[in-house]
């Protein structure tokens, strides 16, 4: 549930691991560009990416169109060889469980986006 994100931003403003997030579009979000995300959305569904010039950069469809939204500072994923890449990590039993890369031709990574090759090597 993304409703926690504006609360976290209020509790920890300018934290390096958080993006400015609000329940409405504020002046700072208008200046930087922002993502519109359904509070209870999943897998990149129903996301709009709006530039600082108020232009629609990308959008995705889905079944969460009638949900309340949050508005989050725009931070575009890095483009590697023509794909926008998202690094996903997860834990199992409180320990590192794994990492995968999701890649898509569009700015929004979705459920059907590709799983990209990844190898983890031990530090020397």
Stretch-by-stretch model annotation:
Residues 1-76:
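Active-site nucleotide/adenylate-binding loops and adjacent lid/helix of ATP-dependent enzymes
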Residues 45-124:
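ATP-dependent carboxylate/phosphate-activation module, predominantly the ATP-grasp catalytic core
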